[in-house]
Curated annotation (Swiss-Prot):
Pfam families documented for this protein: LamB_YcsF (PF03746)
Protein name from the UniProt record: 5-oxoprolinase subunit A
Catalytic function, reaction form: 5-oxo-L-proline + ATP + 2 H2O = L-glutamate + ADP + phosphate + H(+)
Native source organism of the sequence: Staphylococcus aureus (strain MRSA252)
Lineage: Bacteria, Bacillati, Bacillota, Bacilli, Bacillales
Stored InterPro entries: Glyco_hydro/deAcase_b/a-brl (IPR011330), LamB/YcsF/PxpA-like (IPR005501)
Highest taxon above the source species: Bacteria
Family under the similarity heading: Belongs to the LamB/PxpA family.
EC number(s) reported in the record: 3.5.2.9
Task performed by this protein: Catalyzes the cleavage of 5-oxoproline to form L-glutamate coupled to the hydrolysis of ATP to ADP and inorganic phosphate.
Amino acid sequence: MRVDLNCDLGEAFGNYFFGGDHQIIPLITSANVACGFHAGDENVMNETVKLAKAHNVAVGAHPGLPDLKGFGRRNIDISNEEIYNLMIYQLGALQGFCRIHQVKINHVKPHGALYQMGAKDREIASVIAQAVYDFDPSLVLVGLANSYLISEAKNVGLITASEVFADRRYEDDGQLVSRKESDAVITDTDEALKQVLKMVKENKVISKNNKEVTLQADTICVHGDGEHALLFVSKIREILMKEGIDIQSL
């Protein structure tokens, strides 16, 4: 049994510094690097790619909506053409830094609202998947398990990775509980670990209404901007190793 452990990183920009990237990155197998639209900038991207290479961590693009103020977590009325173009633009930016450090982009995981839009809207998911395929058909598209991001990526011929979340609660249909709700984020370490083991070992999660939902767990996400990110990542890694589960990049 194997699983990938990923984290959204490189999300500082300008004079705004947060997250424990230097402490987290040695503990994970895949880093999703912000590409400048929702967070990150040229200096942070360069440093994050360099850091990932130093720790043999797979580098992935983490493109988001153009919304620094809202951290890319607010829905924006945006056309399919704009979505396609912003995907290509951000992938190109990350590829530049990967090239100078002789690292290959391994995967793509949309951020925040763009991720949720693609998970719930088949047409948007198709646009995202097509952009990734057109940029590089060998890339892995990471998306919410059982969502349109996964099905549409498969339709265009991409390799996919179904993602589950250690620090988020689930609806009965397998979607994530909206961050607008007070109970959307898991902050208790024991609860997060229990959820992770159930998802990885049984391919199931218990929804907020106590319903058992089936899902595929190829990669586990911990949000790098979360208050308990470092603790969660270290404890998840520890318990997976204790259970004999291999932690490998996608």
